[in-house]
């Protein structure tokens, strides 16, 4: 009898002719997230990936596997040969463990998936036989409508017995949908946007704008911590840090006050566009949400997007703030995001920002600025570092 983690694959299993490539990517992600942890063989068998457990580090393996996109459920499982003696041994062991942890459980139900169609019994007959094993060894009852717990049996070449199915994040394996450059601030929204795009298989790197010394080094350390949190899901990432204070000063001197926010956003998009082109990114990602702040009106977003012909993904665009906060708490970025450090958007903040800008009007206001030079100078002072893929347990 062998202890394994059984990983259910969700969308990956629907990929038809490309399924093999997605499974390979997923196995690679699993291996990356389990580095520096003892474990046995990792293998694919009829729609699931299995990780052999070594020693007493099951909880550590579970915590790491929860961060792998493409996995829907994780089940601590006993793998045995497909014969009734070893199956009963596994069933008795796992039910005994379950009842010790949950003495309040009084009822159960068996669910069987018969992958080996050559096996002489059908799924209902197998479930009945396993149910008999439980009733013979424990003082509990069958309840097919509302049981306290399930005993699952996946019968393949070998047989897999489990009770718990721990929910993971699902999605697609990292790196199966291109590369994206995330505009990462210190707020609640942008880390969630990065998480959601990484969940769809995008390999996410981060671009952060600051206005040092008007913004502090502690503010940038906060953003680096958020980047590290994202990397726990997507692996090591590149962190670009760009000081836009000189750009903001030029905007403050030369442009109408009510247009400063939208013009600053356009410069951020210019910098992002240049970095994306120079480094082969397929898309730009932001945490913008329709109507949340002055620059996030339909007109404002249209004026911002006019800077680039790269696709700009805004995965939060129609979400309520409470839903965004729920995700931030779930992925452990919320507490860092609400730390009270200033960001570059608070520098030269207009009292009454323009809500309905036009491309023609904003381009007219930008005429006194040497946009290309300002962007080149900012990128010339850019700092780049690798962050994350931490060994957090």
Regions found by a protein language model. Give the residues of each.
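RNA-binding accessory domains that recognize and position tRNA/RNA substrates
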Residues: 1-181, 194-238, 306, 354, ...
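Active-site adenylate/phosphate-handling loop in enzymes that bind or generate adenylated species
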Residues: 132-134, 138, 171-177, 248-249, ...
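General small-molecule cofactor/ligand-binding pocket signal
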Residues: 143, 240-242, 313
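Cofactor-binding loop segments of dinucleotide-utilizing enzymes, especially the Rossmann-like FAD-
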Residues: 185, 209-211, 244, 288
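Hydrophobic/small residue at the entry helix of a nucleotide-binding pocket
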Residues: 188-189
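A conserved beta-strand->alpha-helix junction
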Residues: 227-253, 343
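A short alpha-helix-loop-beta-strand transition element characteristic
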Residues: 332-340
């Amino acid at each position: 009898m062998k202890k394994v983690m059984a990983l259910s694959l969700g969308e990956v299993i629907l990929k038809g002719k490309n399924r093999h490539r997605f499974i390979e990517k997923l196995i690679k992600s699993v291996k990356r997230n389990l580095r520096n942890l003892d474990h046995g063989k990792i293998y694919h068998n009829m729609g699931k990936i299995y990780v052999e457990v070594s020693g007493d580090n099951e909880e550590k393996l579970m915590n790491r596997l929860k961060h792998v996109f493409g996995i829907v459920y994780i089940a601590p499982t006993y793998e045995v040969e497909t014969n009734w003696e070893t199956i009963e041994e596994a069933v008795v062991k796992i039910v005994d463990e379950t009842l010790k942890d949950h003495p309040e459980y009084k009822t159960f139900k068996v669910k069987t998936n018969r992958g080996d169609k050559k096996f002489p019994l059908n799924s209902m007959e197998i479930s009945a036989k396993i149910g008999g094993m439980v009733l013979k060894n424990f003082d509990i009852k069958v309840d097919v409508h509302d049981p306290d717990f399930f005993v699952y049996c996946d019968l393949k070449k070998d047989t897999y017995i489990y009770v718990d199915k721990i929910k993971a994040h699902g999605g697609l394996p990292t790196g199966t949908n291109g590369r994206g450059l995330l505009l990462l601030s210190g707020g609640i929204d942008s880390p969630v946007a990065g998480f959601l795009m990484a969940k769809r298989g995008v390999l996410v790197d981060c671009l952060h704008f600051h206005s040092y010394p008007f913004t502090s080094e502690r503010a940038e350390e906060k953003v680096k911590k958020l980047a590290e949190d994202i990397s726990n899901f997507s692996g090591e990432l590149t962190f670009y840090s760009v000081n836009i204070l000189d750009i903001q000063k030029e905007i403050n001197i030369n442009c109408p006050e009510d247009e400063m926010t939208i013009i600053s956003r356009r410069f951020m998009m210019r910098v992002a566009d240049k970095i994306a082109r120079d480094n082969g990114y397929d898309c730009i990602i932001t945490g913008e949400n329709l109507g949340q702040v002055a620059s996030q009106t339909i007109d404002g977003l249209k004026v911002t997007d006019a800077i680039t012909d790269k696709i700009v993904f805004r995965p939060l665009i129609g979400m309520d703030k409470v839903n965004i906060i729920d995700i931030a708490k779930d992925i452990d970025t919320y507490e860092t995001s609400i730390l009270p450090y200033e960001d570059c958007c608070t520098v030269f903040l207009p009292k009454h920002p323009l809500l309905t800008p036009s491309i023609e009007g904003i381009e007219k206001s930008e005429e006194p600025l040497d946009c290309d030079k300002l962007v080149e100078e900012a990128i010339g002072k850019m700092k780049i570092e690798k962050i994350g893929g931490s060994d957090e347990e």
